[in-house]
């Protein structure tokens, strides 16, 4: 297989169905799917049991004890059968060529970074009901959508690269070997944001890796939900302390 797709989920089976349905439309299907659940929700387990998967699939759970996404991701990394890991969230629907580009451009020493358009509540509902709106780009100008420029697929983007400054945890891929070299995700992050993307970014860069842009190639549609970043600064305080020490191999990761 060419890649292991790791999908982070928490309770929202309706969004996950939309994501998995978009996965069935991919031009590249030589993957395994790992559903990485930060919890043990019975409705999630029942949905996964009944869903018609087209790919090898593993469902990993852990006790719901607050935000422990980094721990869930580390367990998925260890379980993965491919050396190329693609990370997405369970509320991000995929353009049909999403997997193709993450696989096509893969190489050791590289972190691949895409972006996402944030959908309005109305467009999110249409996607949840099964509408394939990615082929109707004018819809993304709907009031309430954000980062609309990220909604458009353009094959020419492989030559006319729009740079990215940072990883986004819902749209990134990298070598399992490279990620293991920094001991995976730092499980000291117990709040949303930073730990699943920016922290990985600076530590892998410190270990010699670089970012390659997949903007407008690996396109992703983020379903609407309320977001709360009020506690992000606590994560950044810890992150800056680790950067000051150049501690790019975390102590509380895959191997404690």
Which residues are covered by each model-predicted region?
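Glycine-rich, basic loop-to-helix element that forms the pyrophosphate-binding segment
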Residues: 63-80
């Amino acid at each position: 297989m060419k890649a292991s797709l790791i999908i982070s989920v928490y309770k929202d089976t309706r969004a996950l169905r939309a994501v998995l349905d978009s996965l069935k439309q991919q031009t590249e299907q030589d993957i395994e799917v790992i559903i990485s659940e930060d919890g043990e929700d019975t409705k999630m387990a029942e949905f996964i049991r009944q869903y018609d998967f087209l790919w090898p699939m593993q469902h990993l759970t852990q006790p719901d004890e607050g935000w422990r996404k980094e721990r869930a991701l580390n367990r998925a990394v260890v379980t993965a059968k491919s050396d190329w890991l693609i990370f997405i969230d369970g509320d991000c629907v995929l353009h049909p060529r999403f997997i193709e580009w993450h696989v096509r451009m893969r190489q050791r020493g590289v972190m691949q970074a895409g972006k996402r358009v944030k959908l309005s509540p109305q467009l999110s509902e249409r996607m949840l009901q099964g509408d394939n709106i990615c082929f109707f780009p004018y819809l993304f100008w709907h009031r309430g959508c954000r980062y609309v420029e990220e909604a458009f697929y353009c094959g020419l983007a492989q030559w006319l690269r729009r740079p990215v400054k940072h990883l986004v945890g819902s749209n990134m891929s990298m070598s399992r070997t490279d990620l293991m070299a920094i001991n995976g995700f730092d499980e000291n992050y117990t709040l949303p944001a930073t730990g699943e993307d920016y922290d990985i970014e600076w530590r892998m860069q410190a270990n010699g890796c670089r970012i390659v842009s997949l903007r407008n190639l690996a396109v992703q549609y983020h379903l609407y939900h309320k977001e709360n970043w009020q506690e992000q600064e606590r994560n950044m305080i810890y992150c800056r302390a680790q950067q000051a020490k150049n501690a790019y191999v975390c102590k509380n990761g895959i191997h404690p």
